[in-house]
Amino acid sequence: MAGFGLPNFGQLTEAFKKAQQIQQNAQKLQEELEVMEIEGTNDDNRAKIWMSGNQKPLRVEIDPSLLSEGKAIIEEAILDAMKSAHEVSTSTMKERMEDLTGGFKLNLPGMGEEN
């Protein structure tokens, strides 16, 4: 059958073993990502947001001095902190997934280079 472009049995077995190993480690990785706390801040560090490694928002901290700046500045500071936390969280997840898969590109939704 190898003459028809199919992999030999040894290659197929090795591929299944690798997939099984990835699957076993994926659950552990999900648990690790869930308990991670990744901080994002705005430029002057007066707005902070923490997310898990799975991009779940965990908490927000606003410096009292920011509260006197007005609605638009507060909103921008929070948005900047959120973007920062999301960027670090997604890049951390991507790195950990690449470590898990040995660099094999999975092209998972939300894990691309676009932003």
UniProtKB/Swiss-Prot annotation:
An annotated Gene Ontology molecular function: DNA binding
Pfam families given in the database record: YbaB_DNA_bd (PF02575)
Broad class of the protein's primary localization: cytoplasm
Record carries keyword DNA-binding: yes
A GO CC term assigned to this protein in UniProt: bacterial nucleoid
Compartments where located: Cytoplasm, Nucleoid
InterPro entries in the record: YbaB-like_sf, YbaB/EbfC
Keywords recorded for this protein, A-Z: Cytoplasm, DNA-binding
Renumbered residue ranges of the record's region Disordered: 89-115
Self-association and partners: Homodimer.
Function recorded in the entry: Binds to DNA and alters its conformation. May be involved in regulation of gene expression, nucleoid organization and DNA protection.
Name assigned to this protein: Nucleoid-associated protein PMN2A_1347
Source organism (scientific name): Prochlorococcus marinus (strain NATL2A)
